[in-house]
Curated annotation (Swiss-Prot):
InterPro entries: FluC. This is Fluoride-specific ion channel FluC 1. The keyword Repeat does not apply. It is found in: Cell membrane. Disulfide bonds: none annotated. It comes from Lactobacillus johnsonii (strain CNCM I-12250 / La1 / NCC 533).
Length: 129
């Protein structure tokens, strides 16, 4: 199978699971589903990125599928903005401000943690290979 087709299929398959998991999170945590998905996604995207940089054994289709497919469909910038806008429109200005800034701060923190864990895990596997 050619490389481009593998990447497209990988994105589609992983997106199915990422989108499904996000829909499930929104069902069980209707108020915090978007925030939870985005924070987990920040960790995962950084983890996958730095893991495969260190490990160097990643297949293009796997890296593309996990990052663009799974994490891309799991997280949502548009819902984050819409949630903030709805809170502002409802007069919940304090809650909207807290939601907005905590999403950015906590997301950055989890991306940083994902980077650290991804680097460490990738290095350990690379040493064993």
């Amino acid at each position: 199978m050619n490389r481009r087709l593998k990447n497209y299929l990988s994105v589609g398959i992983f997106a199915f699971f990422g989108g499904g998991l996000r829909a499930y999170l929104n069902l069980i945590w209707s108020q915090t589903g978007t925030l939870t998905a985005n924070i987990i996604g920040c960790f995962l995207l950084a983890f996958f990125t730095y893991f495969f940089v260190e490990y160097r054994e990643g297949r293009d289709w796997l890296v593309t599928g996990l990052s663009t497919g799974f994490v891309g469909s799991f997280t949502t910038f548009s819902s984050f903005n819409l949630d903030t806008l709805k809170q502002l429109e409802s007069g919940m200005n304090s809650q909207a401000t807290i939601y907005f800034f905590s999403s950015i701060f906590i997301g950055f923190l989890f991306a940083y943690l994902g980077m650290l864990v991804g680097k460490r895990t990738g290095r350990k596997l690379a040493e064993k290979a």
